[in-house]
Amino acid sequence: IGKSFKVTSNSWEGTGDGHALALRAGGKLLGMEFIQFHPTGMVWPPSVKGILVTESVRGDGGVLRNSEGRRFMFDYIPAVFKDKYADTEEEADRWYTDADNNRRPPELLPRDEVARAINAEVKAGRGTPHGGVYLDVSTRLPAEVIRKRLPSMWHQFKELADVDITEQPMEVGPTCHYVMGGVLVDPDTGAAVGVPGLFAAGEVAGGMHGSNRLGGNSLSDLLVFGRRA
């Protein structure tokens, strides 16, 4: 259903047709309010707005900064995560080389927390010229390391935005990414409840991922239930 939103990582065909077909055939939908927004999608130029910027950028040391240059994620650590995420830049940076003895950087909070934080910064007037925030890896790693670890991101920004991420920060913002809700199915077979002969697999099916899908799980969901269907 990503194309229902102004900004999405979904392809052109993500229009919710599968959900509508099942509903019209007598099927049931559940959990359609559970929609996942990936915190880092491209925001410029308009033709590529919403394309994913992989979490590997943050996992390899990239940090989020607002238009004032401030590393703002330290302001958005929920109380429930205080014991697991660093509250200083020094500890957060140490985690990359000593994860056993330091807490994680707040840039690696769950996707929904990071997306809300970015949205809050933009709404507060601390966003980039194109309505996002800065994701910076250029000041964190040598250029040759960036090109080796993040070749697809280097190519993506160079080709689509004329930005060299080894020298410049990226502009990123939340993008509609995945809907956890969908057609109510039998959890063992993928058969749509109430509609004999109808099966749903992948993102069109609901309930497999609760209220917040874990990264990578959608692939196993699609393969397992696609095969069963």
Where are these regions (language model features)?
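Short, small/polar residue-rich loop motifs at catalytic or cofactor-binding pockets
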Residues: 57-59, 177-179, 216
